């Protein structure tokens, strides 16, 4: 595999040359900022009447560069805005902000960030260079069986040490999973020595250990075991390299100290994602290719059949990318970059499934396995790092990734309280739901009387057969007959005696057994022989009910239908669920759907007709009539459902993954002329090879949905499938799935009127959905608790410190570049939704609570991706802020007047503003019109396919515009040579009709393949200029981010994928630029914290928000530093795109949050079913502060 990397490894010498430019800089900024005196005329407006930075700011940041715009560019911008009815709209202004900024490095904003990042990353680059150029010493043959660290010198000596005192090392940790989270053993290697570490739990072998993790359970990397505090100046810069190194970091003692060390972590898995990472779809194809390309193609075709049945053409034409990429595990990454024999990974299973005793038995072999992983990681690093530096050359990228790798989440005793109360609430609601379901089952069982079930729209097709009670037939002998007659006479005597007054019993009678007891004993003796040897299970009850009840021999037996659950197929029927008023029904072939009455002929036109199931369709008509009556009375139902959780853009960064799922097969056909009408007709004719002959005249007029399934033979009714999020070709396995929660909330999916038990069960299912899905991940979070002497004195000396409370931390295991866009990835914290009043445990993020004497400060970057996409389009179009309709709406649009981006899209298509927001982000992420069609039908299932297609077409025509074609030299020659008349548009382009005409005439001239198109452009839309720029970057020979120059993964470069994966490439431009934005912010904040001695550290970044943990005395200065950081980052973006200015409206955060816990808004009380009293009453955490730039300047007097 080394041949794949010849180009990369040849760059090592040139990287070293560049490395010398990462010089230490003694040039320090001023430590105090002073407010400027107000000038009489500071406000600056650009030619489009948009307020820009004040004169003072512009002079400080852009160093007096004159902003000039060509009159032609201004007029073109005005004309464009007029075409979209935006020119002349009211623009807003705000008071200018006056502040003396810290003195910056270099001659301009770009040099400032360059020098700043070089200064921050230089020590780590030097350490990386040591690892890059070294050969590890020989691996020890035997490993020391002793707790703590052991050093193995080059001479073969072993010595016990406090910690590996090394500047750079490669590292790997192993954990015995069955014993908990405590590290079991570790191996490290430096250019000089090998090291091993063994835990006391492994060596001492006690019977029990504390379940709570303490600092003493972790291994030290920078201090002795008994040292828990070092002054700021005593920490030294160290570099630790590992594969998925965030897992290893979580087991290091010093990383839990609140002040934080200067050790940074370099992840070979993250570097691999940046160099040769794969999209989700590519990972599937890569795995398929392991079994041969034919199988890979087959899987692609199957995927396309499921997602886009009308797709035509060869799906994947290039497989070159498979050979220059791999999935993320160390074995495959090593095979890609290093090659050679495959890594041995069998021993890993012993750590996953084995016990501590097993590990002791195989100690030497397992230590060798861990050491081989360290060696493999070092080999990967040596091949990777030059490639990484070549493909991500800006020092800000490296510095930002190093900072991302030291996340820190403080927690206290409320974390355990949260876990207990969420689990208790979940279990109580589960019991209540089961009780409701059992009641429904018991009530339904009563329908057996007089065959009432036959008229029930839901239960008519259940298993209603009854098991009769059985008894043995026995021959009665003469002796038995006499005994029976005697017993009968005794019984008669008892009856006679019962009718007479017997008087008081005698003493002899009292001592004898009573006649009643004797009678019962006799009855038992006669009954037992009649019972079968094997007890019957609930005779006299219907079959479906018997399956819900545990048998008597079951050790957990309880009376009643205790086995019922939401996962059972009959539960939706027992709950009498309806979809738009129609009862749900299950088909073995098509999954869950619903029955719509009105079918007149429900016989298939096959020779062998199946027997029609007697369905009570009249009862269904009555139910729908009642539903319609109630709907009219309550007002029409909303045509737009509530937004699904995965599209909550402010909650997490999963929007792109969703877009990729829905549009992953969209490919670039730029080299092809669009299909002719004849070809389209041929494709359409084969779209449905087998069609059932159905009587379409009988289809209901008042119902729209997926086409009915004519092969579901239910008398008098059509069967419609429930809409699936991934398209009509997929079946719905359960109507209780997460995707249907919005439909429950808007009333589309509901329990029929009547018994409240079903409605309550539905409500509970929604309430417990979050905790049911997430509780394992949340409960398994690795929390390390600290004793008082392990806490920093800033905590213990604070008046709010309480020795009875617990203080600890969670190190979120964030992969700093977990996707091809270099976005960070982590399964719990980076995907956690905000607290919701109807979701148990959804107050998760608010459980990150600061210790006494500290605050969290942070902010969301306002419309981050929208602004990035907008400024790319503006720089491409006229170089003026607000010169495109998309840019103008992003900067100046107002929700109140309907001129903001989301309101404009909503009014154009007739959808809600929240839904419009999803479509807008989806387009920016590269999703095409088919994505919009499917999403429209998902948001509003009442739309027909035709209506959705029309709305999507209208939306894309207004926003993205119309596709036009710029002819190649060959195409222009044909137009002139053949005298073809064409209509010219923007950039001398032609439309689709003219292109087809040229193709037709050219084919008549010669049968050779003509290359007519040079490139394609979008015209006429509000976003056309932006998309032209995005596609220009995405389809360039070497796509790279415009600001920091990071290149796209080799697995997506055009040379490897040809014209495919366009959605992923367009999305990469915006998302990867957003990562550049984050890295710039992290670098700037680190600079300001160090320069102005602000006591704080990076906490976490969740999508477009950042949070810092800051000592309370510095919280307002930190808030000001965050505002300055945003200003400088925006200016860096504009400068790199050739625009020497920034609009005032985006220069600062709308608000910086100062809070005691992690939550979306400082005013959120985070009331949930598991936290009904909210944060203030239950946990004593009041509302925080949200301060804009003017309020921060007032508090700080403009001084950092």
Swiss-Prot record:
Purpose: Involved in the replication of mitochondrial DNA. Associates with mitochondrial DNA.
Self-association state and partner proteins as the record states: Heterotrimer composed of a catalytic subunit and a homodimer of accessory subunits.
Coiled coil: none
Record family assignment: Belongs to the DNA polymerase type-A family.
E.C. number(s) listed in UniProt: 2.7.7.7
Bias (Basic and acidic residues) ranges: 494-512
Biased composition regions of type Basic residues, renumbered to the chain: 472-481
Protein name: DNA polymerase subunit gamma-1
Chain intervals for the UniProt region annotation (Disordered): 471-515, 667-688
Keyword DNA damage: no
Gene3D superfamilies linked: 3.30.420.390, 3.30.70.370, 5' to 3' exonuclease, C-terminal subdomain
Catalysed reaction equations from the record: DNA(n) + a 2'-deoxyribonucleoside 5'-triphosphate = DNA(n+1) + diphosphate
Subcellular location, record wording: Mitochondrion; Mitochondrion matrix, Mitochondrion nucleoid
